[in-house]
């Protein structure tokens, strides 16, 4: 994957799957950091689905996987990841989609991920605290949130956040 991400003529999209047997929440966060370090073009994080007729579904009990009997048959819990941890993974997926996977905010988000291993935890806690993690947000709203978060928690990135804002075509009057 490192090789593919390093190719200059293509963008690599990497997928992580929460709810796989033996996969812990802390490993998901580590894998996001690793993929950010590879400069993956997008990092997708989804929950495992146990579709009828699949080997994984047949072995669910043996593997310690509890899943919804209704479509989309998402994993609800495993021996390694609790219900609340899967909820955290879902919220991390929203964070990645809204910030890392958005070209305007990707460079800054990647740098924050790589330079502070607690960034994802802190930013996720902030987005949850201000009730925004599950809200649809415009590009501008996400930029304002990232700028304010940097201003409060990472002042050394405030200028970079302002530059990303300008490069995204936003007015400085709104910062």
Language model: regions and residue ranges:
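A structural motif corresponding to the C-terminal lobe/cap of the Radical SAM core domain
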Residues: 1-117
């Amino acid at each position: 994957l490192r090789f593919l991400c390093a190719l200059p003529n293509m963008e690599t999209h990497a997928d992580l799957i929460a709810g796989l047997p033996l996969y812990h929440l802390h490993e998901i966060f580590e894998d996001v950091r690793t993929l950010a370090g590879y400069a993956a073009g997008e990092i997708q994080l989804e929950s495992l689905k146990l579709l009828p007729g699949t080997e994984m579904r047949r072995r669910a009990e043996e593997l310690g996987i509890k899943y919804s009997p209704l479509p989309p048959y998402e994993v609800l819990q495993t021996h390694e990841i609790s219900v609340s941890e899967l909820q955290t993974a879902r919220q991390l997926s929203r964070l990645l989609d809204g910030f890392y996977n958005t070209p305007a905010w990707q460079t800054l988000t990647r740098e924050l991920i790589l330079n502070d291993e607690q960034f994802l935890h802190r930013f996720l806690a902030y987005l949850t605290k201000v009730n925004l993690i599950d809200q649809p947000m415009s590009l501008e709203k996400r930029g304002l949130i990232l700028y304010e978060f940097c201003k409060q928690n990472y002042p050394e990135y405030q200028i970079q956040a302002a530059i990303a804002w300008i490069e995204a075509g936003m007015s400085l009057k709104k910062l």
